[in-house]
Amino acid sequence: PLLVCPTRLLREKKCPLFKRRSFMHELEAYLNYTAGEPVQELYAYLRDETDYPMALIWKNMIRTMHPHDFTRSLALTRIIEPTVLDAVTAESICKNRRIALAMHLYFMDMLDQSKAFAAKFPPETDVFISTSSAEKKPQIEAAFADLNLHSVTVTAVENQGRDVAAFLCDLAPQLKDYDYACFMHDKKAIQTKPGSVGASFGYVCNENVCKNAAHVLNVLCEFEKDPYLGILCPPYPTHGLYFMNMCSGGWGPNFENTKKLMKDLGIDAPVSGEKSPIAPYGSVFWFRPKALAPLFDHGWQHSDFPPEPLPQDGTISHAIERIYPFVAQSAGYYPAVVMSKSYAVTHNDTMQAYASGMIRPLARVFDCTTFYGAENSATGFAYKKHHLFSHYGPYSDSKRRHARNWLRDNLPAGSYKVIINTKRAIFGPHEGPYED
């Protein structure tokens, strides 16, 4: 009950405590018995109806928990409206905060699109642009000359490491004193076939990071109102072959090189190969420069990056793409996903279509037309998943959990601890040190 209906226990039954684990529990476990609302209700109750110091929760979550868990349980994804919601705060930000847009522009045939992206930013924005050759610099300066922006600085940089190297080596040092910043680059993803797949990847990035001018102001307000928010990333692409690759974790061949990079940089944050990093796939994202200071201060050089032709995956650039959220977490901030309101509808319909397509074949094998049949189907699926593949599925925990609870309730504390420690020594924990 402390996990499934904590708010009722606190408000109606006067329970004097709640479980820290509520915020780090996997969302799938809540979905066995609820619609996923318990943690959101608990947080709202503690914030609005008690004097509990919410900073304790935030600091503990950011220090000890994987954001894949607490951002989903607390529904921290930002859905951005296409009209300004808080004009007073937006005006105050533009007057009193320093805003920057960093861009790496390589494809001159996409210059109009890049200009349109920058045109959505408020007039107080400083724009820093890197490009790959001195010949492109005057073209970019001419294109951006008529935009209503505070300043535009264009620099030709070494063409090694593409947008990631340009961002860390040449642009980031200029962003350290800004309050809020956005990074974008002209993205084609030309390695994907057909070309529409790569173009749609770029659409996902730009649509959710900078849909229109009101979207930009609303995003700035999100940072202003949440002092723990460090990064806002667009959702990972789910179309074409991206669906299987990203929904299976998003790591690809990059888990070990990301862990190595974290060690080299001294980044200490919870990381797991079983949990997707909330990372800016495509390297288009919003951030608070303070949150990425541990990465910016490394002193990057273009020689740290492989020369062309750049491998499609598994490079230091791909590790950096995934390390951003962990850098922010080590600095005391958390990452979250940002979506435009219109794309959130598309994303929801897309995932429902995928889910229906995957469940329908199971329904042909198991009787899912009644609750009884659905329960048997879920139990059978979990049994196969656990016993054939040695993996605990979201529906496979009932008997194990009931046995654990019975032992805990009926044995002396010392005996229970010996049994659990013996089990962990032989079989290992299910996932992490808190799981029995």
Where on the chain are the PLM-derived regions?
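ER/Golgi luminal nucleotide-sugar-dependent glycosyltransferases, focusing on the catalytic module
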Residues: 1-371, 376-384, 389-392, 396, ...
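Short Gly/Pro-enriched loop/turn and capping motifs at secondary-structure junctions
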Residues: 291-292, 424-426
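C-terminal functional modules of predominantly eukaryotic multidomain proteins
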Residues: 386, 421, 428-429
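Gram-negative host-targeted secretion-system effectors, predominantly Type III and Type IV
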Residues: 395, 399, 406-407
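Short HxH-centered metal-ligating active-site micro-motif
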Residues: 406-410, 416-425
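Structured beta-strand segments within beta-sheet-rich domains
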Residues: 425-435
